Amino acid sequence: MTFFLRLFAGLLFVLPLAAPAAVQPVASVEGITEYRLPNGLQVLLAPDDSKPTTTVNLTYRVGSRHENYGETGMAHLLEHLLFKGTPRHPTVWAEFNKRGLRANGSTWLDRTNYFASFSANEANLAWYLDWLADSMTKSFIARRDLDSEMTVVRNEMEMGENDPGRMLFEKTLSAMYLWHNYGKSTIGARTDVEGVDIGRLQAFYRLHYQPDNATLIVSGKFDATRTLALIVQQFGKIPRPKRALPRLYTLEPTQDGERAVTLRRIGGTPQLMAAYHGVPGAHPDQAAAELLTLVMGDTPA
C-alpha cells in the first residue's frame, strides 16, 4: 500500500507536465512553434539548447493608443503597478533578486510587455510563469501602491522633460499625428497621471489584461513539452473573457503638406529630426524600410 501511495503521488506530480492533446500547434516557422489555448492566449515557443539562459516575454496588446480622453498614461501606470504583486506573490522584486532573474517591463504605443531572463532552470521558469499568470487577473492595482509609485513615475517624466532628444521626438510625433493617439506621449499628461481615478484604472486593467489579448513567448534553453504543459497548467485555468474589446476607428487624415516643429532649449547640441509616414510593421516592405533608416540615420563607422 505504501508503494502504491508513493507511486500515485508521483503520478499526480508528473501527469500535469504532459502537454494536453487538446493544445495542438497552430503553425511552425524556423524553429518557432505557435499554440493557442482555449482561452485565447497565443503561445510562441522557440527552444535553443545552444543558449545557457531562458527568456520569457508576455506581451499585452494594449498601449498608449488605447487610452481615452483623461486616461493618458494609464497603460504605463499599470506596468508599474503589476510589480506590486498579487495575493500569492506579494513581494515580486524580492523574488526576482533571490532567484537571479533579470526582469522588467516596458510600455509603448501598441503594447505593454513583461520579460525576464535567467540561467536555464525549470524551477525559476515555473515560478515566473506562475507570477505572470497570477498577475494577469489578480494584481492588487491598489490606491496605496499608486500613491507610492507616483514618485517613480514623476521622476521618469522629469527625466524625459530634461532630455532634448526625447522631447524633440515627442514634438515630432505630435506634428505627424494630429488626431490619432500615436501623437501623444506614452508616459501621459502630468494632470491625467496625477489625477487618475483608481476605479477607472482598475477597469482599464480588467478590460485589457486578459488571455485573448496577450502573447506569451519562451525562448532559449528549455524543454518545450514540459514548458507547454506548465503554461497550460498555469494559464489555462483563466477563463476566456466574455467582453469584447472596443473597436478603435480613429484614422489619421492624409497629411496635406510638410510640417515642421522647432524646439528651443538653452544650451546643448543642435539636433535635427526628419520623420516620414511609412509602412506598418506587418507589411512586406517593413524590413527594407527599417534597413533604410539605419543606412541613412546611423552614425558612420
Sequence positions of predicted segments:
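Mature N-terminal segment immediately following signal peptide/propeptide cleavage
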Residues: 23-60
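Scaffold signal of the M16-like zinc-metallopeptidase fold and its non-catalytic homologs
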Residues: 81, 86, 128, 135, ...
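An aromatic/glycine/proline-enriched structural segment found at the starts
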Residues: 178, 182, 186, 215-280
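Bacterial N-terminal signal peptides
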Residues: 6-18
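Buried hydrophobic packing residues in well-ordered domains
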Residues: 40, 58, 76, 114, ...
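Acidic/histidine-enriched alpha-helical segments
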Residues: 94-97, 140-158, 223, 242-256
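M16/insulysin-pitrilysin zinc metalloprotease superfamily fold
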Residues: 85, 117-150, 298-300
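M16/MPP (pitrilysin/insulinase) zinc-metallopeptidase core fold and M16-derived inactive scaffolds
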Residues: 55-119, 162, 183-187, 299-301
